[in-house]
């Protein structure tokens, strides 16, 4: 019997082939306009820099989606996590603002400590190989006054290097304009079901200081989002039952209720200066700053499943994230060459406080929560991550020959991170268990990490004929990481520091080959093969002595080990893709589709031990096959329909018992289907334009891994937006999450011990209704 997923894949591939054949027939019979013309009424053309040079989106022979600044504004997309609503093949799991993890084509980042998706702010890579729980999380910048967002699907290891094995998300800001003054503001107010009032104020100012030579652009943002999850303190909190696998009833009379604790305040600014001392030289220094504060976590207790966290003590759980980027792009144009230098330094400080009271009581098998009854009292676990990275890229590109273009470059990065994590000071540890713990310190860890990487890359594009183009690229990379750790506390045998150090290093090559053929100016076929990789790293040592350590040792021995591995190696992917890109019916219809196959070797996987700790190891290989299709059509003047479909079937090739993985099991956080649909309308009426948008995004069910394998239901979200635009102002009414679905985004691990009975579940924002008013000057 053929599995249903295979049938689904075949149907989608056949759909893509049929649509492509239909498009080919239309394209072959129609007389298309010249390539550089854009007749009235045609769909918008977007220029992108996905391949480090400017190209029209439809001329880039890879699977890529781009959203222009106008698209972002028209669709009301305000932060990076929102882009998944309009892009097929990409999903996001998030425990809150600044904690998003992106997955493309099923390449999830459940294992390892670095992401599988590259994330760029202009020329600056902001996807470090971090060691913290939030290390795989991308920054969450506000999207106001962006030029565009580019989402590249498939490995981008040649031009973008480490971390881009699944694809790359690139945010491109608007450069200062040296010829015209400009300013804009946007004000938003809304209300969230089960929450409160949300509001935001954003503004942009562009000042041409010296015509054609010097300009300044300033963007500022402040936003407040109300919470919708409560924190409930329960007296006489029930103990876990059945050895910690079933939570006690927490729905009794509450002692105190804190409503909507996960409220968020975001403030940020972006300042950029464009200086052209000569016609050939452009210098664009910029500073981006953003600060996020959240009063509580975006998670509720999986058991009992209400939108609340129940706790035996009054323990706050605030989160902060501060991010600063200093960048200095310099471009010098010569007759046939372009020299680009991209220098950047960024820092990020994030902190999370978390209620560990329930986890510690259960993990240590204490008879009660209260100190008077033999417990340890309240526990506030913490994690603080202080990250810094310097990067330098230098590129030389040709643009003189119509037949051959080439690009060569070098890259260097120096990343330094300090992780501080612990269970806090717990006075009750001294009295619990008749003083057996002997300390008030459950655990306290300081973990510095330094990673240095160098790379050299090159790319050659040969236009063999007017229709046939062959492109080849190669990147050499080498990295070395040094990790040290100092651990104290009961979990590590007492207050005598346990000191450990480990190193990890690797080098290799990432090749790429692409062939494209234009059947006519509006229809292109392409095929590409590419390799990508993700860096390995060192593991934090697992204690094997003491009360907790002895249990960990038993857990390790049960999987055939006496200790955690000192490091895990890079994992790599080989991707093979065939696709088409076409514009038809006088360019009123755009249809792009592709099919792909990915082989993922040495997949980095988390290993969770029953003692509540864990490590990362290289597991079995995995295979992914799938297809994507994007359709955009102007049905009648002003009415545009967009449809994006992504299918990715993933499976582990072998079993990996240490992580509970069996052969044929789907990868974690990898839904088979992603579907994005929208219908937009714009009709001029005098000096006004009436606009409307209906958008639906869907991701099928998947599994994720915290302490155990969890089933994530499918996500289905409907948004509405309608309003009026003029040349100077706009006003929109919007309804987000119309059906008020509490879509589950992920299950999270705790900072202390973790286990199924106190699983925490992250959800997206409920039904939100509001108004959005903007002015331009």
What are these regions (language model features)?
Residues 31, 369-398, 436-437, 443, ...:
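Outer membrane beta-barrel strand-and-loop segments of large Gram-negative receptors
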Residues 125-153, 201-203:
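Short acidic/polar hinge/loop motifs at secondary-structure boundaries
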Residues 1-85, 279, 283, 633, ...:
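N-terminal Sec signal peptide and the immediately downstream disordered periplasmic leader
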Residues 407, 463-466, 470, 590-600, ...:
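Gram-negative outer-membrane beta-barrel transporters
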Residues 697-705, 724-777:
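C-terminal beta-signal and adjacent terminal beta-strands/loops
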């Amino acid at each position: 019997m053929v599995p249903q997923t295979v049938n689904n894949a075949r149907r989608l591939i056949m759909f893509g082939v049929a649509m492509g054949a239909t498009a080919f027939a239309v394209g072959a019979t129609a007389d298309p306009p010249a390539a550089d013309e854009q007749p009235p009424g045609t769909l918008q053309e977007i220029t992108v820099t996905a391949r480090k040079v400017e190209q029209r989106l439809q001329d880039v022979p890879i699977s890529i989606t781009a959203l222009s600044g106008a698209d972002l504004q028209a669709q009301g997309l305000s932060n990076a996590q929102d882009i998944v609503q309009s892009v097929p093949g990409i999903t996001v799991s998030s425990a809150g603002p600044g904690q998003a993890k992106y997955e493309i084509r099923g390449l999830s980042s459940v294992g390892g400590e670095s992401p599988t998706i590259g994330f760029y702010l202009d020329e600056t890579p902001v996807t470090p190989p971090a060691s913290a729980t939030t290390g795989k999380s991308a920054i969450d910048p506000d999207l106001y006054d962006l030029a565009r967002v580019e989402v590249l699907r498939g490995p981008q290891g040649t031009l973008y290097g480490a971390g881009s094995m699944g694809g790359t998300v690139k945010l491109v800001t608007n450069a200062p304009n040296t010829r015209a003054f400009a300013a804009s503001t946007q004000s938003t107010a809304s209300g969230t079901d089960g929450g409160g009032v949300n509001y935001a104020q954003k503004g942009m100012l562009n000042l041409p200081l010296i015509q054609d030579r010097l300009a300044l652009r300033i963007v500022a943002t402040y936003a407040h989002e109300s919470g919708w999850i409560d924190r409930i303190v329960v007296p006489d909190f029930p103990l876990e039952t059945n050895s910690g696998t079933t939570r006690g009833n927490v729905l009794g009379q509450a002692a105190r209720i804190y409503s909507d604790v996960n409220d968020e305040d975001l403030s940020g600014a972006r300042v950029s200066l464009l200086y052209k001392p000569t016609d050939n030289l452009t210098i664009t220094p910029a500073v981006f700053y953003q600060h996020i504060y959240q009063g509580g976590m975006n998670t509720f207790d999986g058991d009992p499943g209400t939108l609340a966290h129940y706790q035996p003590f009054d323990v706050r759980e605030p989160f902060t994230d501060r991010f600063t980027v200093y960048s200095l792009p310099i471009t010098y144009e010569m007759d046939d060459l372009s020299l680009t230098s991209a220098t950047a330094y960024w820092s990020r400080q994030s902190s999370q406080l978390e209620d560990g009271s329930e986890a510690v009581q259960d993990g240590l098998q204490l008879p009660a929560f209260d100190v008077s009854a033999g417990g340890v009292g309240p526990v506030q676990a913490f994690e603080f991550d202080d990250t810094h990275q310097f990067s330098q890229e230098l590129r030389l590109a040709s643009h003189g020959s119509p037949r051959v273009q080439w690009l060569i470059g070098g890259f260097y990065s120096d990343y330094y991170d300090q992780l501080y994590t612990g269970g806090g000071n717990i006075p009750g540890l001294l009295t619990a268990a008749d003083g057996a713990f002997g300390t008030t310190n459950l655990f306290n860890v300081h973990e510095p990490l330094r990673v240095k990487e160098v790379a050299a890359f090159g790319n050659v594009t040969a236009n063999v004929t007017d229709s046939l183009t062959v492109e080849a690229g190669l990147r050499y990379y080498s990295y070395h990481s040094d990790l040290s750790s100092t651990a104290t506390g009961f979990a590590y045998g007492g207050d005598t520091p346990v000191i450990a150090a480990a190193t990890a290093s690797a080098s290799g090559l990432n090749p790429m080959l692409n062939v494209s053929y234009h059947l006519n100016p509006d229809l292109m076929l392409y095929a590409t093969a590419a390799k990508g990789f993700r860096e390995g790293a060192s593991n934090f040592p697992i204690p094997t002595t003491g009360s907790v350590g002895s249990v960990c040792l038993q857990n390790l021995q049960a999987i055939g080990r006496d200790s955690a591995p000192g490091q895990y190696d890079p994992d790599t992917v080989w991707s093979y893709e065939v696709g088409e890109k076409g514009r038809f019916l006088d360019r009123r219809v755009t249809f792009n589709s592709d099919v792909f196959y990915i082989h993922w070797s040495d997949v980095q996987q988390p290993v969770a031990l029953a003692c509540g700790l864990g490590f990362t190891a290289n597991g079995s290989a995995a295979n992914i096959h799938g297809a994507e299709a994007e359709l955009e059509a102007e049905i009648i003047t002003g009415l545009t329909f967009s449809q994006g479909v992504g299918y990715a079937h993933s499976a582990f090739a072998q079993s990996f018992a240490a992580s509970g993985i069996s052969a044929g099991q789907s990868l974690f956080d990898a839904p088979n289907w992603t579907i994005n649909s929208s219908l937009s309308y714009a009709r001029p009426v005098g000096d006004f334009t009436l606009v409307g948008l209906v958008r639906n995004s869907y991701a099928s069910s998947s599994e994720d891994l915290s302490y155990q394998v969890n089933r994530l239901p499918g996500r289905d979200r409907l948004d509405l937006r309608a309003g009026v635009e003029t040349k100077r102002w706009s006003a929109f009414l919007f309804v987000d999450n119309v059906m008020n679905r509490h879509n589950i985004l992920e299950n999270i691990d705790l900072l202390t011990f973790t286990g199924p009975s106190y699983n925490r579940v992250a959800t997206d924002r409920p039904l939100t209704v509001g108004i959005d008013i903007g002015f331009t000057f």
